[in-house]
Amino acid sequence: MTPQRRSKITPERELELYEAALDLLRESGYEALTMEGVAARSRCGKSTLYRQWGTKPQLVAAALRGTRCVKLADVDTGSLAGDLRAAACAAVEGAGRDTALMHALSHAAFQNPELLCALRENLIEPEVAAINAMVERAVARGEIAPDNPAAEFVAAQLMGVMRARQMVEGRQADEAYLHRFLEAAVFPALGLRATSRVASHP
């Protein structure tokens, strides 16, 4: 569980602490990162960091989430196709800013159960919930059938393809690639009409 905060810091100060933590991650990697180092870099008391986040994994996960420009929970375009395209744009924007950092953290997470748990709690689960909410809104609007068997796999498909292309092809899943994936694989399974012609790209 995420530790309960016992004191308040301003959003501006919180962002400074997040940026300090991420800067140190980029410079030295996860294993070398310490709460003491973040405190020194941000000129903050170490006790404040522990009081706010409790552990290094929780701070790292919160920093990644807190510095994202677009949160999927805020996406609501009025249609499922629009929501999923916006989600794809947000995912590409977030991944593109710190590809090397995310790869390093992914590797560290599978060796550190506490970090993996924190990343799931702070990053993955909220995004899965947001995508599921998009699907639920689509059901309520009558865009897709409530018993459509593909509905439960939308989050896994969209999040999984981001990682899969890098592993299979050695290339990032950019916005154009994700849009083609949505049009060719996700929308047809959901019974949504593709809105653009899917072309073959290298």
Each model region followed by its residue ranges:
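C-terminal peripheral helix-coil segments that are non-catalytic and often amphipathic
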Residues: M1-Q4, G82, A86, E93, ...
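Basic, helix-initiating cap at the start of DNA-binding domains
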Residues: M1-R43, Q58
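Short hydrophobic/aromatic patch on the recognition helix
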Residues: R43-W53
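Tryptophan-centric aromatic hotspots in well-structured domains and transmembrane helices
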Residues: Q52-G54, L119, L123, R163-A164, ...
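Alpha-helical DNA-contacting segments of helix-turn-helix folds
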Residues: Q58-T67
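Hydrophobic alpha-helical connector segments
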Residues: L72-L101
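Amphipathic alpha-helical packing segments from all-alpha helical-bundle domains
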Residues: A104, E114-R141
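All-alpha amphipathic helical-bundle segments outside canonical DNA-binding/catalytic cores
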Residues: A118-L123, A140-A156, E175
